[in-house]
Amino acid sequence: MVFQQFNLFPHLTAGENVMLAVKVVKKMGDADAERLAQQMLDKVGLAEKFDAYPERLSGGQQQRVAIARALAMSPKVLLCDEITSALDPELVNEVLAVVKQLASEGMTLVMVTHEMRFAREVGSKLVFMHHGKVHEVGDPRQLFANPQTAELQHFVGSVSL
């Protein structure tokens, strides 16, 4: 799972942050964990940041390290909870580009997001919730083009797509 707050350990480098879970949970050896961390950082466009500490990374880079850390565990489904909400607007696209690439590679993603253009473009199924209640479920293009509930109609009318 990837959260809106990156939750990187500040005393560990990007590579060490990615390596930690596979070493502790999967009991992977140092050399294999380092190779895997390098591969995952490369996958999110941060191969050159292996030895960088979180304080030296932008918010978007920190979020991509968090994504690499999650991917290192070989999940069947990647859960993303508002992963762009804590980012400066100019950094959002770099994170969304990584998620879009993962989706195109067949990764199953469950995302909580307010990035409606992204949800419409990349999603295969959208669940619209309002005040903790599911109001509509379906194809994103259909839901945005023809919302059935008053809540979704109001929401679609209030956001720019």
What does each model-identified segment do?
Residues 1-140:
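ABC family nucleotide-binding domain
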Residues 128-131, 137, 141-161:
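C-terminal boundary and immediately downstream tail of ABC-type ATPase nucleotide-binding domains
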